[in-house]
Amino acid sequence: MFIDGKWIIREDIDVFDPYTLENIEKITALDREETKNAIEVTEKHKEIMKNLSPSKRYKILMKVAEHLSSKKDFFAKTISIDVGKPIKQSKIEVDRTLTALKLSAFYAKELRGETINSENGLIFTKKEPLGVIGAITPFNFPLNLATHKIGPAIATGNSVVLHPSSKAPIVAIYLTKIIEHVLKQMDIPRGVFNLATGNGEIVGDEISKNDNVNMVSFTGSVEVGESISKNAKMKKVTLELGGNNPMIVLKDSDIKLAAKSAVKSKFLNAGQVCISVGQVLVEEEVVETFTKYVIEETKKLILGNPLDKNTDIGPLISPESALRIENLIKQSVSEGGELLIGGNRQNSLISPAVINIDEENILSKIETFGPILPILTVKDSEEAVNIANNSKYGLQAGLFTNNINNAMKIADELEYGGIMINSSPTFRKDNMPFGGVKKSGLGREGIKYTVEEMSETKTVVIHNI
Ligand code: NAP
């Protein structure tokens, strides 16, 4: 819909506010031919990006950050309306986006190769862009996750075609307006950045298949990630996918702190966070105390209007998603789960639920992506690690213990992309390597690491010198 510097404005897809359920926008849905055209335009502009000096790439990113910074409140409010995220959490997303843009700008000037000693002459390497980056993003962090792809892509001199989720596309449209403005100010052809809104099954699918795309940078569900991986064939692909992130609580830890951390992180964005707590594995000696604190903390949470500054939990992205969570709770209970609090649904809102489960329960096996905190009692750390590793996922794990030697041993044993000690799994800094193993993904994000993924190493050897 923003292709080659022109906006294509149609009313193809209705976008809803997940809290009021009102239709807030109608957006363009590109068909396959239009998507192919958007990719072709991006491809035609790749040399322009490649030839932009590091200073210019730096300047684009810093200027985008400057404009975003002057509209922080507007962007935070837009995220809350688009996604249903509580406003205090949306503000954090905007701040993190600014960090991601500035870090990307830094790396635009920091791209460097190396020299290799050789008796045959001089060997050195250069970092080069890949060409066209096809960025596909999910609904839950529509600004920050888009920037985690756009920022490093620009820093490394790639042109970009972005497909934001049609469930929450508005923020990406406003971000594109800023990028358009900055490119115009700097007299850079707008076709270096194109926004392809529409349905993922058409637009995202075409991006993953199209031969003019050099790399697909995808964040979203395992199911779509697998389809992208098949379609992409020889293209470079990074996949940031879902998980059932375990949090292990051992008896020697600060139990109150662990309970507070579990509740605070589990119910962020109504549980719609890829590194949300999947299940808490608690040593049996402390499970009663832990559960008591968890219930106390859960009762304090305020459910409701995302625009209210006191709200802790807003709606899920749609009534259908909330219904899915309601049904999951029913299934968990039918399998022996004990619902301790919450789980009541009203349209897209679900009150925060805490459930005691065992290892065979559905909630121990899947990514819920909703406000359910399952607690599972374990005999000891060995059993906790076995349950944690008996999973098809491997994104992040949390571990509470006051024994550093044990913590290091368990960190080695856990088959996860990131281990958070004395924290829930829900921790991410924009400059740390981030990504999963097993079905949770392929490759790493985190600006420096995405810069690596989005650039190619060229080796030059000078003989006879
Ligand atoms: P999703 O349904 O997989 O959608 C993600 C993106 O893929 C959207 O832009 C979607 O477009 C597009 N898409 C849909 N079908 C496609 C296809 N066949 N080919 C190519 N693209 C396609 O995920 P979501 O519901 O938006 O987000 C939730 C998931 O994302 C969860 O599993 C969560 O764990 C994961 N996630 C992971 C991370 C991470 O960094 N590891 C971060 C955030 C979220 P449409 O929406 O228009 O269909």
Swiss-Prot record:
<dbReference type="InterPro" id="IPR051020">
    <property type="entry name" value="ALDH-related_metabolic_enz"/>
</dbReference>
<keyword id="KW-0520">NAD</keyword>
<dbReference type="Pfam" id="PF00171">
    <property type="entry name" value="Aldedh"/>
</dbReference>
<protein>
    <recommendedName>
        <fullName>Lactaldehyde dehydrogenase</fullName>
        <ecNumber>1.2.1.22</ecNumber>
    </recommendedName>
</protein>
<dbReference type="InterPro" id="IPR016163">
    <property type="entry name" value="Ald_DH_C"/>
</dbReference>
<dbReference type="GO" id="GO:0008911">
    <property type="term" value="F:lactaldehyde dehydrogenase (NAD+) activity"/>
</dbReference>
<comment type="pathway">
    <text>Cofactor biosynthesis; coenzyme F420 biosynthesis.</text>
</comment>
<comment type="subunit">
    <text>Homotetramer.</text>
</comment>
<feature type="active site">
    <location>
        <position position="274"/>
    </location>
</feature>
<comment type="function">
    <text>Involved in F420 biosynthesis through the oxidation of lactaldehyde to lactate.</text>
</comment>
<dbReference type="InterPro" id="IPR015590">
    <property type="entry name" value="Aldehyde_DH_dom"/>
</dbReference>
<dbReference type="InterPro" id="IPR016161">
    <property type="entry name" value="Ald_DH/histidinol_DH"/>
</dbReference>
<dbReference type="InterPro" id="IPR053404">
    <property type="entry name" value="Lactaldehyde_DH"/>
</dbReference>
<feature type="active site">
    <location>
        <position position="240"/>
    </location>
</feature>
<keyword id="KW-0560">Oxidoreductase</keyword>
<dbReference type="InterPro" id="IPR029510">
    <property type="entry name" value="Ald_DH_CS_GLU"/>
</dbReference>
<feature type="binding site">
    <location>
        <begin position="220"/>
        <end position="225"/>
    </location>
    <ligand>
        <name>NAD(+)</name>
    </ligand>
</feature>
<dbReference type="InterPro" id="IPR016162">
    <property type="entry name" value="Ald_DH_N"/>
</dbReference>
<comment type="similarity">
    <text>Belongs to the aldehyde dehydrogenase family.</text>
</comment>
